[in-house]
Amino acid sequence: MASSSSTSTGDGYNEPWVEKYRPSKVVDIVGNEDAVSRLQVIARDGNMPNLILSGPPGTGKTTSILALAHELLGTNYKEAVLELNASDDRGIDVVRNKIKMFAQKKVTLPPGRHKVVILDEADSMTSGAQQALRRTIEIYSNSTRFALACNTSAKIIEPIQSRCALVRFSRLSDQQILGRLLVVVAAEKVPYVPEGLEAIIFTADGDMRQALNNLQATFSGFSFVNQENVFKVCDQPHPLHVKNIVRNVLESKFDIACDGLKQLYDLGYSPTDIITTLFRIIKNYDMAEYLKLEFMKETGFAHMRICDGVGSYLQLCGLLAKLSIVRETAKAP
């Protein structure tokens, strides 16, 4: 079903809500108050340094730099900004050709303003491309500023890091995501129940982009946002099912817990999906603190083994066995 008449911009085309509701001003960006306040100072003073914006996906890195560039350059944005996704354009030729040619281009800008090169997913650039970029940043420092968005700043070579101001972003809180979702559902007239939005927040895990995409997908597919519809669309292990597994472990019902795990595994969920949901359920489960710490430790070790490639039903059952042993040990006098 079409999302809403307000979303349509052409026949049969629905604009993604993640683009439609992307903030155009730095002050409107949700969460990461410290990072946003630093960018607001840059927007006000107009003296933009080279920047590295580092943090998890969907936390506002690209949106922040786009909004900053719009505020700094105004009507000159189109001719004074070069946007590249470094995961596609990641080789040394891009730096030597596209970026260098843009840096050499003459653009008339107000005093104190510079051209801006935005490199998204810069941590996927090859080492050779980063070395070439370092030299380009140096040579054209009078006319061009560079903004690099990445998930982990450690993958950016030291010479580039030393030439940039580092702005760190963190995952958004549940309340911050909820606030934005309520704005969108009101604007798009989306019928929902509170449990549906809670499910979207759970599946997003601090990622605003994921939250908006899940909201739009659920509304497009079912025209109503409730818990059941959200988990059908997002195709993640249902947290209530996983919660039952944890409860059965705590109640020393190991066989029933294994049966519940087998059901999830047979539905086609990967061990990574199951253990990630399990970890988040344990983290928020009401149990003794020392027990929760031990459960999280064992889950972390199992996750590490699965990430190393040993992803099997046997590993997951082994984890439940260890959690049961931890529980029995805690009960012993």
Curated annotation (Swiss-Prot):
For this protein, the record's InterPro entries field holds: AAA+_ATPase, ATPase_AAA_core, DNA_pol3_clamp-load_cplx_C, DNA_Rep/Repair_Clamp_Loader, P-loop_NTPase, Rep_factorC_C, RFC_lid
Q: Which Gene3D superfamilies match?
A: 1.10.8.60, 1.20.272.10, P-loop containing nucleotide triphosphate hydrolases (3.40.50.300)
Q: Which domain of life is it from?
A: Eukaryota
User: Which residue spans adopt a coiled-coil conformation according to this UniProt entry?
Assistant: none
Sites where the protein binds ATP: G55, P56, P57, G58, T59, G60, K61, T62
N-acetylalanine, modified sites: A2
Say yes or no: keyword DNA-binding present.
yes
The protein's predominant localisation is nucleus
Name the record gives this protein: Replication factor C subunit 2
The organism named in the record is Arabidopsis thaliana (Mouse-ear cress)
Show the taxonomic lineage: Eukaryota, Viridiplantae, Streptophyta, Embryophyta, Tracheophyta
